A protein has these predicted regions:
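Charged helix-capping and loop-helix junction motifs
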Residues: 138, 297, 326-328
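Short, well-ordered secondary-structure micro-motifs
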Residues: 163, 295, 321-324
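Acidic, metal-coordinating catalytic cores used for nucleic-acid/nucleotide bond scission
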Residues: 129-135, 156-160, 288-292, 316-320, ...
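Secondary-structure "cap/kink" motif recognition
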Residues: 116-122, 272-283
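C-terminal structural cap/anchor segments
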Residues: 307-311, 315-374, 382
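Helical hairpin unit composed of two closely spaced alpha helices linked by a short loop
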Residues: 288-309
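N-terminal localization/anchoring segments of enzymes in phospholipid and broader phosphate metabolism
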Residues: 1-269, 331-335, 357, 370-373, ...
Length: 430
């Protein structure tokens, strides 16, 4: 019996030491994640190592998408500080596009998109997680029937081929999953999800999942972003994308995030720059909030320096614990004068406006871990008109919301505190 235990103990100790070595010297975790995984490995030896391989290990993604990063840089071209709205982090940051028009069309975006799809003459490129059967898929099938090149790049969860995708493919369109179905079938990790949701029509009109409609040269840049992802997934030779004529006076910069941007964190840099450069106001609406020392430090410093910082979150998140964790993470911000509101409305993407003229949109929440681990497409737009529309939309949410204060946080019941404590245990599973 003693010998049997010794035979089992040695491999377990070796596996744990390997896991601890990888966490200490190879992974790039934030302090909370680092401590969490270290505790799991120490106190749950066998389960901890298996859990680390399935949910915690990021080394495979870094190696797997490094080839994509190199090919993306070759296709998208270099970025310089002179041609950027934000401090340059070359990985993921595209060149600035001048002469664009940008509109917020959240309420009737489907009607606008259908009208533009019906007017398509050459190409429609759509990148999304899932395309269900509906009005959009029907219009895409009609476009493919009349000879428009329709390409759809979908997420791998569900293997991409939904009823809507099958309709488009049957009509002559093409569709492929972003990643291999084999990897999707055996991957249980809550990362490397496709959050790039946008559509480009004739390289002149484009739509973002956050409800932004764009006209002008930036649509061509989004076309090249799609081309980089399509080439990686399909192995096809990249096609050229025509640059459309100027359509307005907005400067737009595309910022990509995810495992194919291994050098730096471009999306984090985007939001940190916006927060730190705000002189008067910064308004943010996002699905939920998680602790992030650097970003929170910037928000607190700006608030204490006199900048009016306002943040809006939904009362009902996708997961039950996100609302409670947002309240916990917001406590330190409240202590520094940040205004926090909870709305009954649905907030599925992040929008931020700095000083009424510079705005940013992202399909992801303000979770720096998700911004590094999930694929996303983000925009930085210099436009008083678009910024005003976003501020008005967020202002409407604030008007119908309840302001969350320190008094609200301190007045929690004993049962509330138990629920908050339980929710914090799920903080790293977003």
């Amino acid at each position: 019996m003693v010998y049997a235990i010794q035979d089992i103990a040695l491999p377990v100790i070796i596996l744990d030491l390997i896991g601890i070595f990888l966490i200490l010297f190879k992974e790039r975790y934030d302090p909370r994640s680092f401590i969490l995984w270290l505790m799991i490995l120490i106190f749950l030896p066998v389960f901890g190592f298996l859990a680390y391989l399935m949910w915690g290990c990021t080394l495979f993604e870094k190696h797997r998408f490094n080839r994509k990063y190199l090919s993306d840089r070759e296709l998208l071209g270099p970025v310089t500080a002179e041609g950027s709205l934000i401090p340059v982090c070359e990985a993921g940051t595209d060149i600035i596009s001048e002469g664009n028009a940008a509109f917020l069309v959240t309420s009737d975006i489907e009607d606008h998109a259908i009208q533009d799809i019906r007017g398509a003459e050459r190409s429609i490129d759509l990148e999304c997680g899932v395309l269900s059967r509906g009005r959009i898929s029907s219009e895409l099938a009609d476009a493919a029937n009349r000879g428009v090149r329709v390409r759809i790049l979908t997420g791998t969860y569900g293997f991409g081929r939904t009823a809507g995708v099958r309709d488009v493919v049957s009509a002559g369109g093409r569709s492929i999953p972003f990643d291999s179905t084999l990897h999707a079938a055996f991957s249980v990790k809550n990362r490397a999800r496709l959050g790039r949701r946008f559509m480009v029509i004739d390289d002149s009109v484009s739509y973002m999942d956050s409800g932004i409609r764009l006209e002008g040269p930036v649509s061509s840049r989004l076309g090249y972003r799609f081309e980089a992802d399509w080439t990686y997934s399909s192995g096809d030779v990249p096609v050229e994308h025509a640059t459309s004529a100027p359509a307005g006076d907005c400067a737009v910069q595309v910022v990509s995030g995810g495992p194919d941007c291994p050098e730096g964190s471009p999306v984090q840099s985007m939001y940190q720059f916006m927060a730190s450069s705000s002189a008067e106001t910064i308004v943010i609406a996002t699905p939920f909030l998680v602790p992030d020392e650097e970003f929170h430090r910037i928000l607190k410093l700006m608030s204490l320096s006199g900048t009016q910082v306002s943040m809006v979150f939904p009362r009902h998140g996708i997961r039950w614990y996100q609302y409670r964790n947002t309240m916990t993470a917001a406590k330190s911000l409240l202590e520094c004068g940040v205004k926090v509101y909870f709305t009954e409305e649905d907030v599925r993407s992040t929008m931020a406006v700095s000083d009424g003229h510079l705005c940013a949109t992202s399909p992801l929440p303000l979770s720096m871990v998700m911004m590094d681990s999930d694929f996303s497409i983000n925009l930085v737009v210099e436009s008083e008109d678009l910024s005003g529309s976003i501020v008005e939309s967020i202002g409407d949410m604030m008007g119908s919301s309840n302001e969350y204060t320190l008094e609200c946080y301190e007045s929690r019941t004993i049962w509330d505190r138990v629920v908050f404590f339980t929710a914090r245990m799920f903080m790293f599973m977003n």
